Regions:
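Phosphate-binding site recognition
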Residues: 1-145
Length: 145
């Protein structure tokens, strides 16, 4: 796929990926629906180790179960036992990122709030605790209504 007038955005995403090898990076990508946000990220992360997590309108427990499978398949993060809430799953991600670098893309991030209204503050708390020792490149993407 060719991207027109997106060179700067691709370079920023690629630079963030490089920087995250040394310290955690958190990127927020927003835009109208169907403008190519996911395609842009996919192109920018070509060759990187990354996982794509889509926030569907499922229960928190069902999404956590789906995300556990995707994390194991895409970046080799094995979660022992069954995690049923986002906070615990995000903690596993942050702990793993202290040992090695990888990227997590969470698409339709705004939908997490509908499933668990406390999730944004819980993610902020864990990010604040771990980001100084983490090598996670976290990209959250969402649509502007």
């Amino acid at each position: 796929m060719r991207f027109y007038d997106r060179k700067d955005e691709i370079e920023i995403l690629q630079e963030n990926e490089r920087q995250a090898h040394d310290s955690a990076v958190f990127t927020v990508l927003t835009g109208r629906r169907r403008v190519g946000k996911t395609s842009l990220v996919t192109h920018a992360l070509e060759g990187a180790e990354w996982a794509y997590l889509f926030v569907s309108k499922d229960s928190e427990a069902a999404l956590c179960q789906k995300f556990q499978r995707e994390l194991e398949e895409q970046v080799g993060i094995h979660v022992y036992g069954q995690v049923t809430n986002f906070r615990d799953l995000f903690k596993v991600i942050m702990e793993e990122s202290t040992r090695r670098h990888f990227t997590i893309v969470i698409d339709e991030f705004q939908n997490l709030h509908k499933i668990n209204p406390a999730i944004f503050s819980e993610i902020q708390d864990l990010w604040d605790r771990y980001h100084n020792i983490s090598r996670l490149n976290l990209i959250v993407s969402g649509s502007i209504m």
